[in-house]
Amino acid sequence: MHCPFCSTEETKVIDSRLVSDGYQVRRRRECTKCHERFTTFETAELVVPKIIKNNGMREPFNEDKLRRGIQHALEKRPVSADDVEKAISHITHQLRATGEREVPSKLVGSLVMEELKKLDKVAYIRFASVYLSFENINEFSNEIEKLKD
């Protein structure tokens, strides 16, 4: 791998460990020329199904869009970046595991809600209020009551 500091091709791995529940390998590397250290992440490149939007349009799965949506729901909540990445990896893994070439966006929304429910109840309600299109306070109350069970 090329050194990001001096562009030489000679780098060596000084530490490797599994992260994201074993779906990624984190490698600590050192350049043999300039001796700078840097971190790389390695993941298997697998096909993620296309997303069928509610209007019938199809678009490629966009992990950045998923991340932005989850981070928006979690804004100012005490959830670590590592936990967010684990949730994203879990959702992506579940989408791949369907074995389908295309999946409805509703499936992605449901998977996000499941992960947010585990991460942070407030973020779950924030996301659910938009995703489920709450129109009045009773719908909020009903969803909050479900969380208490």
Curated annotation (Swiss-Prot):
Q: Which UniProt keywords apply?
A: ATP-binding, DNA-binding, Metal-binding, Nucleotide-binding, Repressor, Transcription, Transcription regulation, Zinc, Zinc-finger
Does the record carry Lyase as a key word? no
Residue ranges covered by zinc fingers (unnamed): 3-34
Q: Which PROSITE patterns match?
A: ATP_CONE
Q: Which residues form the ATP-cone domain?
A: 49-139
What cofactor(s) does the depicted protein rely on?
Zn(2+)
Molecular functions per Gene Ontology: ATP binding; DNA binding; zinc ion binding
Family per similarity comment: Belongs to the NrdR family.
Biological role stated in the UniProt entry = Negatively regulates transcription of bacterial ribonucleotide reductase nrd genes and operons by binding to NrdR-boxes.
Per its record, how is this protein called by name? Transcriptional repressor NrdR
